[in-house]
Amino acid sequence: MTEINEGLREGKNVLLHGVTSSGKTHLYLEKIEETIANGKNVLFLLPEIALTKQIIQRLEKKYGKQLGFYHQKLTDFEKVEVWRKVKNNEIKILIGTRSSLFLPFQNLGLIIIDEEHDAAYKPREVKPFFNAKDAALVLAYFYQAKAILGSATPSVESYYAAKNGKLKYVFLGERFGEVALPKYEIINFKIGRASCRERVSSPV
């Protein structure tokens, strides 16, 4: 958390590179609570709304009706209702997909872009064509808000930007709560081909 705060104080957005189960969600929640306590609102971007179960449960328990959702599966009526609540500053935390970037936010203080590497932020088959990550950073600049891009496997462009000082790079290399890393085995496929005839399937 200290490194994240240092980067944000320097006026930089943050690339949070954390291995699976490293505690990214825990850090997100801390920054969300801090932002709300400071009287600002939060936009939590996801490539797919189905990825939100863990964080939704915790936020719903604490913020109730101040938590909102926006995605393509909503009806037109539901979308208008969310638009109205955002406009009237009734929603403090909005969890949504890329289309939520066009909502009339009030007093936005933090944008979290989770799974920032995901291609769903820049689909080629869905109109309008735009890169949601780039749009989110522009939105953060417009509102003078902070932005955190999180991923276990950062995109090349975000990693490059971090290494060139445009983003604050924060690496979480250990699993949260001493959760063990998965075991893996390096396989030599040149040797494997010769033995494939002797078994139904080789290790993957």
Which role fits each region the language model picked out?
Residues 1, 16-28:
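Glycine-rich phosphate-binding P-loop
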Residues 25, 110, 117-186, 197, ...:
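Post-DEXD/H (motif II) to motif III coupling segment of the RecA-like Helicase ATP-binding lobe
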Residues 96, 113-114:
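Hydrophobic residues in beta-strands of the RecA-like P-loop NTPase core, especially within AAA+ ATPase
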Residues 39-42, 66, 89-93, 107-110, ...:
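Loop/turn-to-beta-strand initiation segments
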Residues 22-27, 34-59, 78:
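Conserved Walker A/P-loop ATP-binding site and its immediately adjacent core
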Residues 9-16, 24, 39-42, 91-92:
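Pre-Walker A (Motif I) flank of P-loop NTPase domains
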Residues 58-94, 105-108:
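Conserved motor-coupling elements within RecA-like helicase/translocase cores
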Residues 1-9, 31:
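Pre-Walker A adenine-sensing motif
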